[in-house]
């Protein structure tokens, strides 16, 4: 989403994590996505770092100017989700990959974080206003994955009404529709595919 919002066109290579291509592992041995190879040969392989890079590249990427306390809240929330929420999300959604893991307890830990966040959401399309901001593109993908694990349970939960509305706005947004495009898995002899496709 950050690449789209910053109008940064890249060569896209869709990969299967079950069969990681060697060129990907050569530039980022940890073998996770996303991976962004820059023109100068440097590599960014963390989502939040790619977002930060896009913001530095296009300083007017987001329309709203946040207050200092809002900026601090955003950074604290992103860190919370990138570390604590993701830890519990992985053990809830992929419990069979871990030993002696109680999926429900990790689900409830995620829920506790969402319940706290729910109290801070404005009654607008996005978190702070009707304009998308850094917190939206950084946090909503985690919440989307959390819902996917058990949509019926998530949708029926009465503790996070603002989170549910916020996520639904995201799921129905033009932004998500523009970036959630299915690409075939990259093969070495494939022609170059550019992303975003409509800039």
Regions found by a protein language model. Give the residues of each.
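GST-like domain detector, emphasizing the conserved glutathione-binding G-site
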Residues: 1-118, 122-127, 195-198
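Hydrophobic/aromatic-lined pockets within catalytic cores
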Residues: 55-59, 97, 122, 142-143, ...
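Short, mixed-charge aromatic SLiMs
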Residues: 77-81, 114, 160-176
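Charged/polar, low-hydrophobicity segments characteristic of intrinsically disordered regions
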Residues: 91-93, 169-188
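GST superfamily/GST-like fold recognition
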Residues: 127-152, 156-159, 164, 170
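Acidic/histidine-enriched, glycine/proline-rich intrinsically disordered or flexible terminal extensions
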Residues: 183-199
């Amino acid at each position: 989403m950050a690449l789209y919002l910053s109008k940064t066109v890249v060569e896209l290579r869709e990969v299967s994590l079950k069969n990681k291509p060697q060129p990907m592992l050569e530039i980022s041995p940890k073998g996770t996505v996303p991976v962004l190879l820059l023109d100068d040969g440097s590599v960014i392989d963390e989502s939040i770092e790619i977002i930060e890079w896009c913001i530095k590249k296009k300083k007017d990427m987001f329309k709203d100017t946040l207050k200092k306390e809002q900026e601090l809240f955003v950074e604290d929330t992103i860190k919370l989700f990138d570390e604590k929420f993701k830890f519990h999300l992985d053990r809830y959604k992929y419990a069979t990959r871990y030993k002696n893991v109680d999926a429900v307890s990790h689900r409830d830990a995620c829920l506790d974080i969402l319940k706290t966040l729910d109290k801070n959401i404005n009654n607008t399309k996005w978190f702070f206003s009707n304009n998308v901001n850094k917190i939206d593109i950084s946090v909503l993908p985690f919440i989307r994955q959390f819902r996917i694990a058990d949509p019926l349970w998530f949708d029926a939960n009465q503790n996070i009404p603002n989170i549910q509305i916020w996520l639904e706005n995201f799921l129905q947004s033009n932004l998500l529709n523009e970036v959630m495009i299915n690409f075939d898995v990259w093969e070495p002899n494939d022609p170059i595919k550019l992303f975003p496709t409509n800039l």
